[in-house]
């Protein structure tokens, strides 16, 4: 069993974006391929959780396993994706990454995993005053908590955090750049992110 593994969440419907965000172009590749490469600098074991409709296309872009949600919990949001990844790869800790934060740096995963401590169930950054539970790390014991929530048809990350012993980490305290955590939810945000990229 490895100590650390990565789970990339690419199973959302991207309704506000209008097309699958995982396959949006970024730095001459796709969001999902870019994020897997960034994670791969720090983590050897990575799995991508994909929506059924795009799984075959995602597989063309990444050199890591691409799976769907556990059938019983398919479509139950990020909790289903996280627990599906935990079932696929055995590890002590899992770094979670959504496919729509393309600015993330490999430095973040080094910082995040350095903060893990078995006293805690989760390590969650707080960036500009906001919790970022999808750019966080979770201990494998959280798997049972997720199953219990899904059994009760509870799907929110907040409900999971309320049941965990969480180590909250201020981005400023660990020299994390707030830009790493920017989400791209709409085409307008995508255009702005592309502009910011070309201005770097």
Swiss-Prot record:
GO terms for molecular function: GTP binding; metal ion binding; molybdenum cofactor guanylyltransferase activity; nucleotidyltransferase activity. SUPFAM superfamilies: Nucleotide-diphospho-sugar transferases. GTP binds at residues 9-11, 21, 69, 100. It is an enzyme of class 2 (transferase). Its main location: cytoplasm. Signal peptide: none annotated. Its cofactor is Mg(2+). Mg(2+) binds at residue 100. It is found in: Cytoplasm. It comes from the Bacteria. One of its GO terms (biological process) is Mo-molybdopterin cofactor biosynthetic process. The N-terminal domain determines nucleotide recognition and specific binding, while the C-terminal domain determines the specific binding to the target protein. Belongs to the MobA family. Transfers a GMP moiety from GTP to Mo-molybdopterin (Mo-MPT) cofactor (Moco or molybdenum cofactor) to form Mo-molybdopterin guanine dinucleotide (Mo-MGD) cofactor. This is Probable molybdenum cofactor guanylyltransferase. It comes from Bacillus cereus (strain ATCC 14579 / DSM 31 / CCUG 7414 / JCM 2152 / NBRC 15305 / NCIMB 9373 / NCTC 2599 / NRRL B-3711). The gene is mobA.
